[in-house]
Amino acid sequence: MGRAVGIDLGTTNSVVSVLEGGEATVIANSEGARTTPSVVAFAKNGEVLVGQSAKNQAVTNVDRTISSVKRHIGNDSWNVEIDDKKYTAQEISARTLMKLKRDAESYLGEDVTDAVITVPAYFNDSQRQATKDAGQIAGLNVLRIVNEPTAAALAYGLEKGDKEQTILVFDLGGGTFDVSLLEIGDGVVEVRATSGDNKLGGDDWDQAIVDWLVEKFKNANGIDLTKDKMALQRLREAAEKAKIELSSSQQASINLPYITVDGDKNPLFLDETLSRTEFQRITQDLLDRTKKPFQAVLKDADVDINEIEHVVLVGGSTRMPAVTDLVKELTGGKEPNKGVNPDEVVAVGAALQAGVLRGEVKDVLLLDVTPLSLGIETKGGVMTKLIERNTTIPTKRSETFTTAEDNQPSVQIQVFQGEREMAQHNKLLGSFELGGIAPAPRGVPQIEVTFDIDANGIVHVTAKDKGTGKENTIKIQDGSGLSQDEIDQMIKDAEAHAEEDKKRREEQEVRNSAESTVYQTRKFVEDNKDKVSEDIQNKVEEAAKAVDEALKGEDIEAIKDAMEKLSAESQEMGKAIYESEAAQAGEAGGAEDAGSEDPNVVDAEVVDEDDSEDEKK
């Protein structure tokens, strides 16, 4: 069996670490650096360059150099075409992983076969699966996909002994942002809550500088540098260097000779000075976007700021003074821990987790969570949640649903992720059909839907017809990644529209209840028409028709009133039956049983896709 490593597959840089004598060691790459740029280039001579060598030639090979691919992983519609061949984000990421694997093997002098790879805590299922696929493409057996803040807390917490403590991990990397609250003690690392933004990171700070430079140059020379790919790449590199310089200096000089030429073919130079104050001004909106996830984590974990004992900064972007100051402000003046390397701590935690899984590290338990709620669409477009956000994983949950129509042969299971009450406002992860349901009146078949989230955070959904034993399963991996707006809006919209969502859900539940009551009442009358007078039957039918008519409109109170009248007439009918001959009493009891519901069946109905669309119209 080969060795196992921990890998932090980052947006801008990646790190590999290994356990040696029970201690995690960060492995330097073939160039001697402890971090490897997540950049892949296809040279014109056919050679594939990875890491620093790829980054070094980016200016002269712009169209064939790929960086920040992590922002696209899990998005099936994204690819890059080189020499008439299309490469997915998984394939490009695999190139970086292959270099890390080779460098680790060179250092260890033996094969590396297994790896724990980290991902942002807010990565969805398709992004996690795509990361796992990238590992497999690189020739690695991926032991586990671990959330980056959790890995960081694992690395930090194990050094602190058995004392119980509450840790806040603020992780701002090159392309993603996460904030997590964890409890550590007695070898247990438990995530209480997590939140974040998959499209916020150091790249955005770089882009803000690029935009500032482009505007300055355009005002001075009347030329838009964004039209020149080579010039734009030089601007990006200069912006990154200026950002890093401003972490330790009050100003940075940006000097790019021969950046372009004017209309007369005369060379033009770019020479600007960016102060730290100006840099913080043009990036303030990016900094502000970290506040809501921070507040959401405290709220979800039900933890007061004063209860946080340690603050751990992760990701190179946390070196920016404005970020450090903001974290200090948000945590009530608490000084962030300086004892961990923000670039390396995630890979160290991943190596420790690899050791746990291989039995090399004892008495450590890692309890992670799922970042967003998961559920299915039920009748009326309602989002019926089976697993709430911040549930500890791995986890499994089952609910029993039923059909919406008589003799319904199949059900369409649509799986959603998000916090809104109505399914259409959440993210559709995937769908599948369960067919072969035996003909039966609606409400009779029992369809058991099971959500199973594994330790990697990857979702498996199974639907099973309890009557026939037939089942179907889907592993959620076919959806595209959640965009920044989608993720940011999910929690935000859920709060902003909470009352509206609640009202719509209640209205739909009233409609569902009314339809079900009318159906059951008419069925009951049909089964017992020889026991009640025609006059009573007519009154019940008139009341049922009134409910039908009310359901055609939008007035929920009218539906409720019609339901009350139908209930009153139904009670009169029941009274008449019970006052009939004693010989009919047993049959009346049976009829009552026929109208009752299985207490284990959820009062929601799975509908066919077509029917679902009709409900939404």
Curated annotation (Swiss-Prot):
Induction: By stress conditions e.g. heat shock. Pfam families: HSP70 (PF00012). Residues 605-617 have a biased composition (Acidic residues). Residues 496-515, 567-617 are annotated as: Disordered. Residues 496-512 have a biased composition (Basic and acidic residues). Keywords: ATP-binding, Chaperone, Nucleotide-binding, Phosphoprotein, Stress response. Acts as a chaperone. The modification Phosphothreonine is found at T176. The keyword Cytoplasm does not apply. Residues 579-604 have a biased composition (Low complexity). This is Chaperone protein DnaK. One of its GO terms (molecular function) is ATP binding. Belongs to the heat shock protein 70 family. CDD domains: ASKHA_NBD_HSP70_DnaK-like. The keyword Nucleotide-binding applies.
